[in-house]
């Protein structure tokens, strides 16, 4: 019996409201991913693009400090609304948690949060969304790859 060739099928579920996704990643921490992601977002905005930035580093979010954002995002009942600063739409777990509270989450909680940020944030007609990834190859990277970014 001859078997059929294996074909991998992805569930196509891109980040809604965006045209292009740029994920900024590195296996090592402290190499400037967040700084680069922020500067890239600002540069694209200065070129006239509509830009958003998603801080996907659940354990060490830096977007609140880099953008000096000290507020919580609003919700329309089903989706979170990104916070707009410098004409850039922003979302981070750091907007939803207390800075002093340690994030002691396991895989399923991280996966759920990343899916929420990818699918339940009302990104408004963006040309680019910059995803600031955490270091390594863990749950966040796997989750984003499975939702076909």
Segments (PLM) and residue ranges:
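Phosphate-binding loop that captures ATP/GTP phosphates
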Residues: 50-105, 111-113, 118
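Signal for well-folded cores of large energy- and translation-related assemblies
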Residues: 19, 23, 45, 64-71, ...
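Short glycine/serine/threonine-rich phosphate/pyrophosphate-binding segments
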Residues: 31-39, 61-62, 136-141
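Phosphate-binding/switch loop-helix module in NTP-utilizing enzymes
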Residues: 97-143
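Conserved small/polar residues in nucleotide/adenosyl-binding loops
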Residues: 147-149
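Walker A/P-loop phosphate-binding motif and the immediately C-terminal alpha-helix
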Residues: 20-57
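Extreme N-terminal, non-catalytic leader segments
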Residues: 1-27
